């Protein structure tokens, strides 16, 4: 008997789920109205009904109903050698994974990129990159994502999830540009058990 027969008609889950997780996180961020406002409105008060731009122009700031995926929120890595950035953006990608048998850990990197001119907000000392990072922390830190409170089609493939923020870093993209980068590393555990296919 072939020792691999027990794996016939089964599919490994670890790397497969790793690829789905960044898309899941991007989808969740795209459904957060505050994050969408921080990304779309380059004003000093993006959560208000009216916003004050840097040139003192007042604009109307309505809720954003359209998806920001592939416009402001990207399920991919960013170009680390970019010289300029004219609008705020978020990039999400699977950072790494580790497995020790039937259980694995997957790390997701969320990179928040903000042009330095848009970093400051009206509230004393508040910064756009940290405001977005705080929204992400509130969405994911120690929150169990189960079938009853998430996108059903993704959770059916991923299983119940619990995220933890492992670290964050804040700095400039490079010494020669004015792009602020706030990187958050999320961790979640996934089953690596092979499933029948």
Q: What would you call each of these model-derived segments?
A:
Residues 98-104, 174-179:
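Short, solvent-exposed beta-strand/turn "edge" segments of beta-rich domains on protein surfaces
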Residues 197:
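Long, contiguous binding/interaction regions
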Residues 103-121:
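Short acidic, glycine/tyrosine-flanked loop/strand segments centered on an H-E-D-like triad
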Residues 1-99:
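Small/polar-rich, solvent-exposed N-terminal microdomains that initiate assembly or binding
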Residues 96-98, 112-118, 188-194:
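Beta-strand elements of well-folded, non-transmembrane domains
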Residues 7, 120-127:
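Short, flexible/disordered intra-domain loops and linkers
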Residues 129-191:
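Acidic-leaning, charged glycine-interspersed low-complexity segments
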Residues 90, 106-110, 182-186:
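Hydrophobic residues positioned within well-ordered beta-strands of beta-sheet architectures
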């Amino acid at each position: 008997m072939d020792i691999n027969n027990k794996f016939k008609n089964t599919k490994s889950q670890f790397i497969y789920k790793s690829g789905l997780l960044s898309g899941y996180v991007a989808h969740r961020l795209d459904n957060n109205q505050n994050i969408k406002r921080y990304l779309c409105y380059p004003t000093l008060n993006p959560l208000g009904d009216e916003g004050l731009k840097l040139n003192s122009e007042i604009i109307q700031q309505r809720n954003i109903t359209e998806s920001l995926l592939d416009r402001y929120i990207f399920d991919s890595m960013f170009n680390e050698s970019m010289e300029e950035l004219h609008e705020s953006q978020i990039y999400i990608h699977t950072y790494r994974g580790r497995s020790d048998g039937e259980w694995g850990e997957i790390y997701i990197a969320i990179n928040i990129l903000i042009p330095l001119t848009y970093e400051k907000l009206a509230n004393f000392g508040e910064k756009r990159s940290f405001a977005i990072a705080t929204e992400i922390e509130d969405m994911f830190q120690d929150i169990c994502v189960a079938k009853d409170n998430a996108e059903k089609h993704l959770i059916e493939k991923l299983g119940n999830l619990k995220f933890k923020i492992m670290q964050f870093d804040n700095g400039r993209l490079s010494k020669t540009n004015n792009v602020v980068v706030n990187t958050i590393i999320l961790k979640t555990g996934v089953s690596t058990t092979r499933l029948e296919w």
